[in-house]
């Protein structure tokens, strides 16, 4: 990481013991699997809609396993904070891909994932700020009903999930009708969803909506 000093391992409790000294952690390499978690926690993206001034930062997680799921996955996201037990607060999925270990395709997938990581490490934070500003000013519709209709049609969301996301955005965001406000509503909904497949579907919808303004 010498070439990318802004990116680093997040701090976690030493040996996983709650309350212990916090040390850089988030990298694991075994005989048949690996895990890498990096954050750019020193370059705030300046979210203009954040009334808490908590900051918004970039991160990514790369996983590979030859057993179990037997897949290579890469997830790029925005976040507010990472606590000592590596819970990611304000998680906002931006992009990701998953490739199963089938034939020789995994070699190409590795190359693709490393290219994505390299691009992310080198990317100017100003590009992400531009996307946020654009998403904050672009509206899905002029009314609640119009936003819900657009969300259901464009994001493959159920009417129930679309309405719940809007309610959360209305409660916490400056403009729940904006792309950015509604994305934050989806993120909060994902955090309240108990099942992993449900969280994935909501996160995927949020990612799809955010990338539509890129």
Where on the chain are the PLM-derived regions?
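Amphipathic alpha-helical segments
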Residues: 1-18
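Intrinsically disordered, low-complexity regions enriched in serine/threonine
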Residues: 16-33, 38-214
């Amino acid at each position: 990481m010498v070439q990318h000093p802004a990116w680093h391992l997040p701090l976690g409790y030493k040996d996983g013991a709650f309350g212990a000294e916090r040390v850089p952690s988030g990298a694991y390499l075994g005989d048949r699997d690996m895990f890498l978690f990096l954050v750019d926690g020193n370059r705030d993206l300046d979210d203009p809609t954040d009334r808490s001034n908590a900051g918004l930062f970039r991160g990514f997680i790369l996983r590979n396993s030859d057993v179990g799921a037997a897949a290579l996955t890469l997830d790029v996201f925005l976040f507010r904070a990472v606590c000592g037990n590596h819970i990611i607060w304000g998680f906002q999925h931006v992009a990701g891909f998953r490739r199963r270990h089938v034939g020789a395709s995994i070699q190409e997938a590795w190359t693709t994932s490393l290219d994505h990581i390299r691009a992310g490490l080198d990317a100017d934070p100003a590009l992400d700020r531009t996307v946020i500003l654009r998403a904050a000013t672009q509206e899905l519709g002029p009314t609640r009903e119009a936003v819900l209709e657009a969300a259901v049609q464009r994001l493959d969301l159920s009417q129930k999930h679309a309405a719940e996301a809007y309610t959360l955005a209305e409660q916490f965001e400056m403009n729940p009708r904006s792309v950015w406000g509604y994305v934050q509503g989806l993120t909060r909904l994902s955090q309240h969803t108990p099942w992993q497949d449900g969280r994935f579907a909501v996160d995927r919808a949020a990612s799809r909506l955010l990338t539509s303004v890129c």
